[in-house]
Amino acid sequence: MNARRKKRLALATALIGGVAAIASLLLYALNSNLNLFYTPTEIVHGKKDTGVKPEIGQRIRVGGMVTVGSLVRDPESLHVEFAVHDAAGGEVMVTYDDLLPDLFREGQGIVAQGVLIEGGKLEATEVLAKHDENYMPPEVAEAMGQTHEKLEYDSTQKTGY
């Protein structure tokens, strides 16, 4: 092989290697920023199609209804814990260390975004609540199958305390 062909081969090899390295770094960056939506049942039992569960430490969003009677507030801080369930019976505990949205109530649809820290526990970085009694995020509405029942609230539940 002459010198000219060796240079071309080295250049082509370096170019292919560089493109492969850039592609792998790009895919890694995209994978670490993915924020997949799961229902509580999918977190506990895995996806219906594949049975795949989210991994511990994975950033996810979970949507469902806040279980009535599950809200526990720490009187000394902003820390709250509550359970989120869906129509299929799955339930996930959510912990959150910030102010909850004004419209957050037990029995209401929410979407919590955060990191899965145990099999059935999410450490939320953001909690989103619906903005009126008829609205529900599309993912939650689909996951719940619109089978939830409207709850009647007493005065303490309406104030959130």
UniProtKB/Swiss-Prot annotation:
Choose one Gene Ontology CC annotation of this protein and give it.
plasma membrane
Q: Which GO terms describe its molecular function?
A: heme binding; metal ion binding
UniProt KW keywords: Cell inner membrane, Cell membrane, Cytochrome c-type biogenesis, Heme, Iron, Membrane, Metal-binding, Signal-anchor, Transmembrane, Transmembrane helix
Q: Which residues cross the membrane?
A: 9-29
Provide the topology term for how it sits in the membrane: Single-pass type II membrane protein
Cytoplasmic side, ranges: 1-8
The residue ranges for the Periplasmic side of the membrane come to 30-161
Give a GO biological-process term. cytochrome complex assembly
Q: Where in the cell is it found?
A: Cell inner membrane
NCBIfam families per the record? PRK13165.1, PRK13254.1-3
The protein here is known as: Cytochrome c-type biogenesis protein CcmE
Q: What is the lineage of its organism?
A: Bacteria, Pseudomonadati, Pseudomonadota, Gammaproteobacteria, Alteromonadales
